[in-house]
Amino acid sequence: MLHTGGSDAPVTTGNYIDGVARPADGGRTYALFNPARPDELVGHAALSSVSDVDAAVRAAHGAFAAWSRTSYAERAAKLNEVAEYLESGQDDVDQRARLFCREHGKPIKETHLEVLRLGERFRMTAAYADRLARDEIEHGPPFDTIITRQPRGVAMLIVPWNWPLSILGAKLPQALMAGNT
């Protein structure tokens, strides 16, 4: 949940759990300030509680059975939809980059690149669908190896503050492509 009143207006973010944008349990938030300009309020983010995390994990467990049974082609199609959304509209990309610049105090060039690369990571992962579609990969002599792929369950991703979109892009699309939630 992201509410903006303009490109540099303060934003309010919440949780997105089980397909629904919602505030943190109890409605608690914390203020985000621009580290490069400590008096500039960037916005407010949800101060999630244990019950919010539990709700997210329950939702992910609930979605796992259906998602893990989808084909690699179906997963790739969804990842490409996400990439298209992330890359759509130069104005949206620029606005996201400005927001991350203000939130992290990073140069705009870095945040712009990070926003664009997130979509690329989803698209690159989706491109592997055909290679992953085989249930087993057997290597012949001199190797006695069989690789099988099975979704494991819920993936919890914690990303650092300094490159949040880059780290997310290096973990989330792959977990989803593997059939995890």
Task: Name every feature range the model reports, one short phrase each.
Residues 1-37:
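Hydrophobic face of amphipathic alpha-helices that form TPR/SEL1-like repeat modules
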Residues 19, 75, 122, 155, ...:
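Residue-level signature of catalytic and energy-coupling elements of molecular machines
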Residues 24, 110, 164-167:
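Secondary-structure boundary/capping motif
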Residues 31-32, 49-53, 165:
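A short local loop/turn or secondary-structure capping micro-motif enriched for an aromatic residue
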Residues 34, 47, 149:
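Conserved strand-loop elements at the edges of beta-sheets that form or border functional pockets
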Residues 38-133:
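Glycine-rich loop-to-alpha-helix module at the N-terminal edge of alpha/beta enzyme cores
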Residues 135-181:
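Conserved small-residue-rich beta-alpha loop and adjacent elements
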